[in-house]
Amino acid sequence: MNIYLHVEVALRELDSKLLLGVIAASRGHQVLISDISEIERGLRRGILNPGIFHTKSITPSEHKINFHKRLIDKKFLVTSLDEEAGLELSDEKLREYLNDRASKKTIRQSSAVFCWGDDDLQILKNINFKNRSNIIKTGSPRVDLWKSIFLNYWGRPNKKPKKPFL
């Protein structure tokens, strides 16, 4: 299977996309990690074979909806995991945030919408109340990178951060 991993902000997303890509490649998949402009260019030129397009959000903009439709029409599957999870928001603010980040239409365009945890899972299921089976709690590979197995990759911090951060 061809897997296309969309990176918007490399500093924030590249390590986790590399983790996903390495795991997928080790299982026999072909993986391309790229920004959206190069993926769009490859699609226009007809050089990308159908596969899974995994994006960093399904914000319901006209451009994104049309791009996902072109992918689907060319037999791609669209999946997403929102990179900006809104973890520190109150329930009401998280609901508002996710309503801006997803819509019934963009959820329905997606073969799978992956969630960080129970809060975003429930809110996204409420947005797309007719078909909830494509909304799945998986956690985030960004958080997986915090595990002790990756300590050699990151190294030990010289000092403890002053405030919580992601």
Q: Which role fits each region the language model picked out?
A:
Residues N2-N158:
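Active-site and donor-binding regions of nucleotide-sugar-utilizing enzymes
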